[in-house]
Design a protein with these regions (language model features):
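Surface beta-strand/loop "capping" patches
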Residues: 124-128, 132-160, 652-679
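Axial heme c-ligation environment in periplasmic c-type cytochrome domains
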Residues: 226, 232-246, 259-288
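Short, surface-exposed alpha-helix to beta-strand junction/turn motifs within ectodomains of secreted
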Residues: 676-715, 740-748, 756-759
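Beta-propeller domains with acidic blade repeats across secreted/periplasmic ectodomains
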Residues: 299-662, 679
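Beta-strand-rich N-terminal accessory domains
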Residues: 19-144, 158
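The canonical Cys-X-X-Cys-His
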Residues: 221-231, 273, 287, 291, ...
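C-terminal capping alpha-helices of c-type cytochrome domains
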Residues: 275-303, 731
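Sequence/structural segment immediately N-terminal to covalent heme-attachment motifs in c-type
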Residues: 210-230, 244
Length: 769
């Protein structure tokens, strides 16, 4: 971004007192205080004081960064479905000589110090930023700063800055400087000054498209860079691979246009390309014209890729049998608990002690909402109130002792309602020191509270330059204390969009397939473990450490695609098992886990589809219902092309015939059914498909199944109640995935088998070390 600097003759007016009197203002935006990346700098706070004045603070260093006339463009994945972009400012600077550097003096000498962001608070329509300066002697000086737009007697625009200091030790002076001028704050008191600027009559307009090819502009404004990169395969092929494989003739271009608009699979492996019906044919042709300019002299096979050779057969499949489910699980009733005009992209979901639901939203509002009467399921009785706004991509939420904590992209924040009006007055920073850059993919997911600590997951950056490195905190689970201190528990993760409590008060996460992750995972968090993503390995190691095995491998597009938050089932027929959602494939999967040789392992079952959008967050309410928060990104991370959803599933008592559990045994496996298998059915071992393989992590997106083989069942024993099957299988290998596919059996009550497949991760075989 380029801002025009205005040469000024500033008038600085000093005063030594300040007030908190009401100061009604006509703010230019409904949400006028906004956390985000800004102009490629993380941890920024933009304040829209007036149409004539925006200010931005670097909250990482607690300093005023810029004052300008213009505005802010909220662009990017959460705002405009453009993953490769981030918010930028536009307009013209009032000054480039701001007093924006802190100084500490002790007995006339400069003192070492560091500054800590403590958040901000709204009082009487003014914003008060809170900082703490820790001196070399560990004194903690508290500072409040309140900026406001004013005009001088001559009509010139100005910025008023009010300060309040406390806990300043004797002999210590706190001041602001720009290298030439200083302003000393009154110790343990109030201070203020106003800077007047020359008016800006014609601020620089919003930035125009910067790319030199219209096709690239269209791609940046769409979601193309979510799944594709220029020279390396990601979810889909690289643009260079496309340019090398296809000729730029009318027949081929017509087919590619159709593929982009309608979606499909099979050309580049198992990954499904989502359709883009919103794109016009002319726009797609312009994009393709740009892609063909990327053609190289390399052969297609020399471009980094990971095309799968084990495509699933399309024949002899039906919903739940070799293919995804289509409808709602028969044992549950589904209710949509939002009105049509409320469209939340749910980033976090929890409940208050009084039963009200709390959600955070991954959108341009960055909101937190209190939703009442959700247990009724009646949208005429359900009420929604915005509790907070302006948060930066809040993808985690937790309620602790009735207090709301939210995990933003760059900060763990406590939201405080001081006056009881159900609107947050204070956004208190608990932790904002973990590593972060401006990369769009550095998501922070969460949030779980356990025994005095919060647990959150950090996503890897995906658009670093060749001379840049991943920050040490990325691709990790962090344990964060109430005092803001944190430690890294496990590392080597990629995009761990899900964390929650599991059996025995343990913590489980999900991670998404990609580079060095041949399939998605359900992982039991054990301190110190490395989980395979080599971008996050310790630089001092010449070789990566051994990769810890997940509790469950989740085969891409067979079982899941973009797994999200897991949740432990508290009651009912699936008590003690876990469920997890899927943002891209949609629906919910069920996870049965058991402990073998002291470690968790288990299997995945398809559970339900029939929901309004991809599933991002899950939480059980006091009424026993499963509450479902949906989220989608146009084109890339979405199910059915929809971006929002809020529903609940309530158990209705209707039995469903399905596999309840698969347990590893010394002889093979035990399969437990929810109902008796019909006595009219002959259990034929040759009709049950058993396969095994292991996954090879590679630098490419995903990874191949290695040593894929079909296994034979030597013998089947069935219990007298026809609910338990004991499968005696030779040739099983540890650290392999075992695939099961049953025939389309029916139960003794003539119910059809809901789903025939399961995938078991056999890390250990009982009875073997």
């Amino acid at each position: 971004m380029i801002l025009r600097c205005i040469a000024i003759s500033s008038l600085i007016l000093f005063a030594t007192c300040g007030t908190d009197q009401p100061s009604p203002k006509n703010r230019p935006k409904d949400v006028w205080v906004i956390r985000s990346v800004l102009d490629r700098q993380p941890r920024m706070l933009t304040i829209a004081l007036d149409t004539n004045c925006y200010v931005a603070y670097d909250v990482a260093h607690c300093t005023l960064q810029k004052v300008w006339k213009g505005g802010i463009i909220l662009q990017g994945a959460a705002y405009t479905n453009q993953p490769n972009l981030q918010p930028v400012s536009w307009g013209s600077l009032y000054s480039d000589t701001l007093l924006n550097k802190w100084k500490i003096g002790r007995e006339g000498e400069a003192d070492d110090f560091h500054v800590i962001n403590k958040g901000y608070q709204f009082r009487n329509d003014r914003l008060y930023l809170k900082f703490a300066i820790v001196t070399s002697l560990n004194d903690t000086v508290k500072i409040e700063e309140s900026p406001e737009y004013v005009t001088g007697d001559d009509g010139r625009p100005g910025l008023e800055r009010k300060f309040k200091t406390s806990n300043v030790p004797p002999g210590v002076k706190v001041s602001l400087t720009n290298g030439k001028s200083n302003f000393v704050l009154n110790s343990n008191g109030t201070s203020e000054f106003t800077t007047l600027f020359n008016p800006i009559t014609h601020p620089r307009e919003s930035p125009k498209e910067s790319s030199d090819h219209t096709g690239r502009n269209y791609m940046e404004k769409s979601d193309c860079y979510t799944c594709h990169e220029v020279d390396r395969q990601n979810v889909g092929p690289s643009f260079q691979q496309i340019a090398v494989r296809y000729k730029s003739d009318e027949t081929i271009i017509g087919k590619l246009v159709s593929k982009v608009q309608n979606g499909g699979t099979g050309e580049w492996g198992t990954s499904v390309m989502t359709g883009h019906p919103q794109l016009a044919e002319g726009e797609i042709r312009t994009m393709l014209d740009y892609i063909f300019t990327l053609k190289t002299d390399k052969k297609e096979e020399d471009i980094e890729n990971n095309q799968s050779e084990d495509l699933p057969p399309a024949a002899n499949t039906s919903p739940g049998d070799g293919a995804p489910l289509k409808g709602l699980h028969p044992s549950f009733d589904l209710t949509t608990i939002r009105k049509d005009n409320f469209r939340p992209r749910v980033g976090g979901l929890a409940f208050m002690p009084d039963g009200r639901m709390v959600i955070s939203t991954w959108d341009s509002t960055g909101g937190v909402y209190l939703i009442d009467n959700v247990e009724t399921g009646d949208t005429n009785k359900i009420t929604v109130k915005r509790f907070a706004a302006g948060l930066a991509e809040p993808l985690g939420l937790e309620v602790v002792n009735g207090e709301i904590y939210v995990l933003q992209k760059h900060e763990l924040t406590k939201l405080i309602d001081h006056n009881g009006d159900d609107v947050a007055d204070e956004y208190a920073s608990i932790c904002s020191s973990y590593g972060a850059t401006a990369d769009f993919h550095e998501f922070a997911f969460g949030l779980v509270y356990k025994e005095g600590y919060f647990y959150a997951t950090m996503s890897m950056a995906m658009r670093l330059m060749s001379n840049e490195k991943q920050l040490p905190d990325r691709g990790a689970v962090l344990k964060i204390g109430m005092d803001g201190r944190y430690e890294k528990l496990i590392y080597g993760l990629r995009q761990p969009n899900g964390i929650n409590h599991g059996p025995d008060n343990s913590i489980f996460i999900t991670d998404n397939q990609g580079q060095w992750l041949p399939a998605s995972k359900l992982i039991h968090v054990k301190q110190g473990e490395y989980h395979g993503m080599q971008w996050g390995r310790i630089d001092t190691l010449s070789e990566p450490p051994p990769m810890a095995m997940p509790a469950i491998w989740m085969p891409e597009n067979e079982a899941t695609n973009s797994p999200s938050q897991p949740v432990l089932v508290p009651d009912g027929p699936y008590k003690g098992q876990m469920l997890h959602g899927d943002v891209t494939a949609g629906g919910i999967q069920r996870d049965f886990i058991e402990k073998i040789n002291g470690e968790y392992q288990g299997c995945l079952f398809r559970f339900t589809q029939g929901l309004e959008t991809g599933v991002n967050r899950l939480c059980f309410g006091k009424d026993g219902a499963l509450y479902i928060g949906g989220l989608g990104l146009v084109g890339g991370w979405s199910y059915n092309g929809k971006q929002w959803g809020l529903q609940k599933m309530k158990y209705n008592g209707t039995p469903t015939f399905e596999m309840l559990a698969i347990r590893a045994k010394s002889y093979g496996f035990e399969i437990e059914m929810t109902e008796a298998i019909s006595r009219n059915i002959k259990i034929d071992p040759d009709k049950i498909t058993i396969q095994q393989w292991w996954y090879l992590p590679t630098a490419s997106y995903g990874g191949p199944k290695m040593n894929l083989e079909k296994l034979s069942i030597k013998k089947i024993d069935i219990s007298t109640d026809r609910k338990l099957l004991q499968l005696h299988i030779d040739g099983l290998r540890k650290e392999h995935v075992i695939y099961f596919r049953l025939p389309k059996w029916s139960s003794e009550t003539n119910r059809p088998l809901w789903t025939t497949e399961s995938w078991y991760t056999l890390n250990h075989i009982p009875g073997r070390n």
